[in-house]
Amino acid sequence: MWSFDIHHESGTYAWRLWASDGHIAAAPPEPFQSRYVAHRAAERLAEAGVDLHVSTFVDPESGHHRWRLDHPETREPLAVGYERYKTADEAQSAGESARHQTSMAGVM
């Protein structure tokens, strides 16, 4: 089962979305100033789940494709996938799977 955790690093907080195989699947595009705000952001992401929009982009550092989950109306990025993929189709498929799993993930 996929799950969110909240971690603290360098004075900020972020949620991480963990896949069932134990790797980090996604994180927020920007950190948060408090544990509470990071926790609420993870809860809102899980609540939005299947309504989120999946988009792909080319990572400027690696040149590989990645996915992100965007707000369904504003298209604001809410989550960015960790993995890099050779093709946009691979990234899209992984993002679709993550979107589905996000809706069922618990927040620790």
Q: Regions from the language model: what does each represent?
A:
Residues 23-35, 76-89:
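A short, exposed loop/beta-hairpin motif centered on an aromatic-Gly-Thr core
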